[in-house]
Amino acid sequence: MSLAVSTEPVRIVRHPDRVVELRLDDPGRGNALDLRTAEALRDTAREVAADPGGAVLLRAAGGSFCVGGDLRAFAGRGTGTGAYVHAVASAAHAAVQALYELPVPVVTAVRGAAAGGGVGLALVGDIVLAARSARFRLAYTAIGLTPDCGASWFLPRLVGPRRAADLILTNRVLTGDDAERWGLVSRSVEGEELDVAAHRTAAGLAAGAGAALRAAKGLLRAGTGDELGRHLAEEARLIATLADGREARDRMAAFLAARDRAKAGDSRAEADAPESVS
């Protein structure tokens, strides 16, 4: 029997096959990152790091992996927005760093939307599986912000600088199949197969030669932890600085207004509304 040992909005489930599952579990909000969720993610990631089992599975409940920052939590704070965004980013970044530095393999399962910070969080896995219908979108520049959660560090290393610039600057959307072709994810699978495939992959790793897997992962990531940490700090500084500016505040307000009109049934607003952050 699996044993749940943490609380909402992020949970830890320890499976008998030595897979430790870290589950984003706030599906009603698309697993969006506000301060409470970011701090819960940080704390659970650190708890996992203290006892990671044989492999870690990072997944999310509901129809979206993570829609990124909760713009409704950001909006209306005026010049205090930057301080709040910095707190959210710093907590989420501590989680990314803890997961990146885990000695055991990490498998990520992505379903639905992975937007904004959800992209960086997804990419922390050693092996990333995505539903074919998953949708990856950075979305930051559309609302006057810059990437966080390590997205601007992971992307050039995974897809190359040209494609990373395309994703970050134009907010291009990639499906799970696109992401596999680009090298953003390890492989894409049918949506109904994702959970089983991801757990099977993690369980296979947990049952493998533990010392060899840890050593191999150490070689793959040798010397990069400190570099990632410095980059995360700079991402947090930049996104917080921009969040205090008029451009970002106006764009976030416009984004939320478009979403509200779309929900009210305005087809024109729905066509124009971005499909990312909550």
What are the language-model segments listed below?
Residues 1-61, 97, 278:
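Conserved CoA-thioester-binding segment of acyl-CoA-metabolizing enzymes
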Residues 1-17, 48-51, 171-176, 196, ...:
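C-terminal alpha-helix plus adjacent terminal tail
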Residues 9-12, 97-213, 245:
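Crotonase-fold acyl-CoA enzyme core
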Residues 22, 26, 40-41, 58, ...:
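Terminal peptide-recognition signature
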Residues 37-40, 88-91, 235:
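Hydrophobic alpha-helical membrane-association signature
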Residues 60-95, 114, 227:
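Glycine- (often His-adjacent) and acidic-residue-rich active-site loop
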